[in-house]
Amino acid sequence: MTPNAATVLPVAIAGIGAYLPPRVVTNDDLAAVLDTSDEWIRTRTGIRQRHVADPEVATSDLAIAAGKVALADAGLGVEDVSAIVVATTTPDHQVPGTAPLVAAALGTEVAAFDVNAACSGFIYGLRVGGALVATGSGPVLVIGAETLTRIVDPTDRSVAVLFGDGAGAAVLAPDPHGRLGPFDLGADGQDPSMLWCPAGGTRRPVSREVVDAGEHFIVMRGGDVYRNAVARMVAASRGVLEQAGLGVDDVDLFVGHQANVRILDAVAQRLGMDPARSHITVDQHGNTSAASIPLAMVDARDRGRLEPGDTVLLAAFGAGLTFGACLLTWHPDPVGEEGGAR
């Protein structure tokens, strides 16, 4: 079935791309330095390995690499792009944003800005980038990129085993048939300490005391995160399906934020979805926050799980708390001469 035309943006994903650092850290590698084991990690998270960036590699480096692949996949050059949106919670610097650095490296001076919605960031980026395209902009490059291993305490097994580094990107282009949306986004900032870095911002700036206490690292209340992630992703998914006038059986592929396989399984179960429709990459990538959904989309495409015309459901939950979902109709053809995805 086709989503209600009144609820979608006249925008298509014209190309996608991914980049993962070459270094792979397995659960056994972590077990050699932490009080943990491959079995302990797998049974609780589904994670088997994660990619880790070398010390000299920053978030922008990953974003640039993924962006180049996405542009090539779309058959476009950077000169065709009207804006660059980088979704990240691990920027190169507090100031400036990461997107201008990415734009400069790609060779353009178009509008470039960051979106920080944590693990929901890529869906937020699609909404913002899609709106730019829908209101007359040319193609927009949306990138989710993270070096989360830089902000986890390597001695804390509760978080050190969860996260990985990587980047994924999508090129959004005008499409009169409207293939992006609807969206259901939200945030609840009443209890940010559920998943946060306690220090490092203006509330509690970096100091020797902060670093000595490890307060610049991610801390989380795992049980609360699990319950909220499942509830919020289910609610947002139902919201977009209702807006589109679709049922869960109309979804060809579900790509959820790859944080924990138990969360993904619970979301599919509560939606009444066949778990076989859920694409899983958390076992290979770990939690890559804003990069996880585009990385999973590229993996699904490469494995032949995305076909033209497929209805794809994206859903995420992250620090903030932020959450959201969107639908899109997969249409990966390159951008045509008149600017629309063919």
Predicted regions and their residues:
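Condensing-enzyme catalytic core mediating Claisen C-C bond formation in acyl metabolism
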Residues: 1-55, 156-227, 231, 235, ...
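Short glycine-rich phosphate-binding loop at a beta-alpha junction
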Residues: 79-87, 248-257
